[in-house]
Amino acid sequence: MNKNKDVETFDFGIFRMERNGRFIAISTNRSKEDHHRLISKLAEYHKTIPLSIKTKAEKFEHLLQKFNSFDIIAHIAFKNTIINPETYKEYLHRGSFAFIEYLTLLCLKHPFSSGKVCFINSLDVEKTQASIEDIFRDTLWYYISEHAFNHKEDYLPPSPIENLRFKTIIKELYVRNPGYPHHLEDTLKTLFLPLNEILKSKIGFNIDEAVSLVKGIASLVENRLCERRRKAKDSETQLLKEVIQYKKGKCNSNKYPEEVIKTLSMLSEQDAKKKIRICLGSWFFFGLGLIHSFSPKELAEAATLPIEIIKSFLNIFSLSFGSIDADFCIPAPIHPLKTQPIIYHDERYMCPSFSLLLWAIKPRLEEIIKNDSLWKSYEKVRKNYLEDESLKLLGNVLKEAKIYKNLKYKLEKDSQTINFELDGLIIFDNTLMLIECKAGGLSSPARRGGPDRIVRDLKKLIAEAHAQAIRARNYISETSEPIFELSDGKILTIDKSKFKSTFLLTITLEPLNAFTPALYKTKELGIFEDNDLPWAVCLFDLRVICELIDFPSQLIHYLKRRLRINELGIAEAHDELDWFGQYLKEGLYFEELPKSGLDHYRLLSYTTEIDDYYFYINGVRKTYAPKPSQKISNIFKQLINELEGSGKLNYLDITNLLLEMSKKDRTEFEKLVKQQRERTKSDGRIHDFTLFYKQSIQTGVTFVCVKGLDNSSLEKMLLDYSLRKKEQTNMEYWIAIGNIVNKCGLVHAFVSV
């Protein structure tokens, strides 16, 4: 290893890894022969893995029979889920909900085990955890080596669909909670509210009761754990006190055996305290399955709901021991716990993975009503909800925007007039947003990695929606006077001369994070009719972004930077919020990557500050965590706020340029603004500066300071100056901002030509 300050290099001959600050680059320089040998070895290894996993799983299952099923599941759940919200970092957390689920599924293959040992110690837990992790490592290698097995003859790299299959399976295997719980709760309550009465009569509970029971189960177990911890702490204090009293010759304990106190008194106070803590720690974990499990009556008391509702809920969301297929051994991307995350035995119930419970409500209820007459009503409700919520979120950010829903327009095709629809249209300054919403979800075969179903579902959920938005965009661009009919029958006429940018948005109800963060990788599937890709985002991510955006122009700028990722086609992130977190921290600039020699670039996690913020505002975290935001100086904030508040067209041209500036350029711009304003204040003369930016469009920017001039005269002066300078310099674009130094504010006129 070669270490030099912030640079670390690991060179293993044919494999090289370099860390430069927060960035990690991996490169290989295998010869063709080395590559062929590697593929052949991986292909051979791939064939052996299923049997290896089966053998390990059988041995592991035999080991599990010596434990009480509820106890061992509770221990592994505790180990993998307990976090400190004050210090939690997603990328540092070694536990996994998937480990708990796999253990539970293995236990559910068999009848409930009462166990042969009465106490599960830490060594038992570590061995159990190690066995699970070992099987998951094998499973990961099975899917990593799959392409080598498929291409052991031609040695070709994985195809686009093979890559998407791998990502889909890995996401389904490992990733849980693709949104924040309070957002999901709001979505569930609003989505199923119109069906509450029908649900109540059909399944015995409504959506509000379902959400209350999810909270009730978590609260019941949490309160029990806290109470046991409190008792352990109190006992530690009391027992140590009595040991000290015993040493002084005073022993009047009725609570603890004298033999115990006598033994502890032979130790130093520090050693006695350690011994007591170890013993009470063991007591805390004794019978952990009883703490984690509950009866319907106990849950009814905790949730303050009738026992009939409790039983109906548990009946729908529970699995019994012996219900899992006897052949199950390899961790699967799709499994029954994802829709029925509660297990039961002898009238006691347990939720091994609390993270699954809230997320199971929607797919489980959809399973129940799928083949019912209620399904069509639900589909309509679901689509309307997604459209309404999406437009509301965008409207909350773009406060001065004009927002329209469910528009109709007509196109002539083959001498026929055909009616088409557009889910949403937003007019914001000189920008149009054309929005299509898809409320459906990935099918189970697609989640399992079925190539044909992945292609079919992506086409249905993203490509078809995008084609509809493209059709509307083409209608606007190719029609002299585009006309839309609104839902109330009124007519909207689009004045094309006012718009410089058009964004196409595809919004889904279901997270599609295996595909949408690097949508350009789906182009080779042939599902898109146009090379121009949309911003495809799920409702949960859209909500976070809209809640964290500081001002309207920032959302427009984020869209421009985000869509640039598709154009560059080299960078990739785990999910949309990593892109947004990177934008807030570093601006989402990857223009230099194509010149770097890298053929692939992946972001690490950028959601830590977002997690901290939501933990804090929801009371999970006590330590203050500010809302994540871009570092923007007060002068730039003032410029942007005044431009946005001007009420004049084309201010987005200028705010976008200001946001596009690098830190160095912003510092220079601020310095010159201050200098020229002071000069004009001092001598009363006109002072200005001009800077040039070579971005996608070559732009000249002038800031002019005057004294004693009115706004309209200043605007005319800026326009004349900009037109002249644009012609003289052959720049494609010219922007000018005017400041009257004897008035409040920084922006009193602006032009863009």
Where are these predicted regions, by residue range?
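Beta-sheet entry/capping signal
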Residues: 402, 423-425, 430-434, 501-505
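Active-site beta-strand-loop-beta-strand hairpin of nuclease catalytic cores
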Residues: 426-434, 438-444, 691-701
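Acidic, metal/cofactor-coordinating or nucleic-acid-engaging core segments within structured domains
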Residues: 458-492
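Phosphate-binding active sites in nucleotide-utilizing proteins
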Residues: 383, 394, 403-426
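Acidic, metal-dependent phosphodiester-chemistry machinery of nucleic-acid enzymes
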Residues: 1-383, 388, 392-396, 401, ...
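Active-site-proximal structural scaffolding
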Residues: 383, 387, 417-418, 428, ...
